[in-house]
Amino acid sequence: MKKTKFFLLGLAALAMTACNKDNEAEPVVETNATVSFIIKSGESRAVGDDLTDAKITKLTAMVYAGQVQEGIKTVEEDGGVLKVEGIPCKSGANRVLVVVANHNYELTGKSLNEVEALTTSLTAENQNAKNLIMTGKSAAFTIKPGSNHYGYPGGTASDNLVSAGTPLAVTRVHAGISFAGVEVNMATQYQNYYSFKPADAKIAALVAKKDSKIFGNSLVSNTNAYLYGVQTPAGLYTPDAAGETYELEASLNTNYAVGAGFYVLESKYDASNELRPTILCIYGKLLDKDGNPLTEPALTDAINAGFCDGDGTTYYPVLVNYDGNGYIYSGAITQGQNKIVRNNHYKISLNITGPGTNTPENPQPVQANLNVTCQVTPWVVVNQAATW
């Protein structure tokens, strides 16, 4: 009889640990309420004007009372998650709803501080718009016994309708940097010597922050880790000081096309503290006026002038969202310059007026052969114009 009893208890325990495929294992909290909510994601605009970056295919929602996780639920939908329904939780005041989308974190049982301390690193997978992490956090609100609905339209049947008509905002952790277009209009003094073909060129992030936080007013991490898409001679912007790391990330390099670019993470440029700028660069062969590779003695002359390296490659670097170099800006630059901010798309229009440089990680003359216009919009897009 005892064996039968223990066997039945074991089956009951197994049944209690089983969970719905849409749910994390729930915290051990006595529940008397549920929370459902609608989300609002940012404007649908990706680096290549692809809309897939706005899609949420996995969303984890957590309910917190102070540091205690009182409820958690994960929903996965290939077609996109727009809401999460019926999160079991406990009623009470000063509850906070925290969400993380498109992630691979283990979140069950984590305190609020632990979740808000999570970080992410820039990887090749991030250049696929489907793998962009998004986060959101509500203001404190009261959960009442029964059904609670957050962000649903007014008139929704509910025991407690919170933030009626205003869904929970969920925003991307990443930012976008891209070339909206590159034109070549060689100035008079160069027309008889040089040309450049963007269609045959490549683009790369010369300097990009490797990691960031996923929550907070600023996501800039306190690490000094950076990535590059193509190796160039060291310069003033190169992360080579003590304590800094600078690693190759091949996904930060691709062929030039209108709208081509990369997803990057928040960063801040501060020369006094050796915080590096984010640099987007187009590079390729510096050609003669007829569009042919340079030959001697023209190649040596161009190398000596600092226009290209030994194999004739010239670089046109742009410091993204930099306040200087004669860059022209338009759009919603509401969060300042000399930094990369989450959920912003920095679209750079480039007008090449002369040869580039062989030291793209060094400061360039203000009157360099580059006109830059940058637009910032909320996805947010920043349009930046540069002239070389």
UniProtKB/Swiss-Prot annotation:
Per the record, the major location class is other
MF terms in GO:
structural molecule activity
Q: Does the keyword Membrane apply?
A: yes
Q: Which UniProt keywords apply?
A: Cell outer membrane, Fimbrium, Lipoprotein, Membrane, Palmitate, Signal, Virulence
> Which InterPro entries does UniProt cross-reference here?
FimA_C, FimA_N, Fimbrillin
Q: Show the segment(s) annotated as Important for oligomerization and fimbrium assembly.
A: 379-388
Q: Which family does it belong to?
A: Belongs to the bacteroidetes fimbrillin superfamily. FimA/Mfa1 family.
Note from the entry: Strain ATCC BAA-308 / W83 seems to lack fimbriae, probably due to very low expression of the fimA gene. The name (major fimbrium subunit) does not indicate the abundance of the protein, but is derived from the greater length of the major fimbriae. In strain ATCC 33277 and strain 381, major fimbriae are 300 - 1600 nM in length and about 5 nm in diameter. In contrast, minor fimbriae are only about 80 - 120 nm long. This length difference is observed only in a small number of strains, including strain ATCC 33277 and strain 381, and is due to a loss of function mutation in FimB, a protein that restricts fimbrial length in other strains.
Report the protein name in the record.
Major fimbrium subunit FimA type-4
Q: Which organism is it from?
A: Porphyromonas gingivalis (strain ATCC BAA-308 / W83)
Q: Point out the gene that encodes the protein.
A: fimA
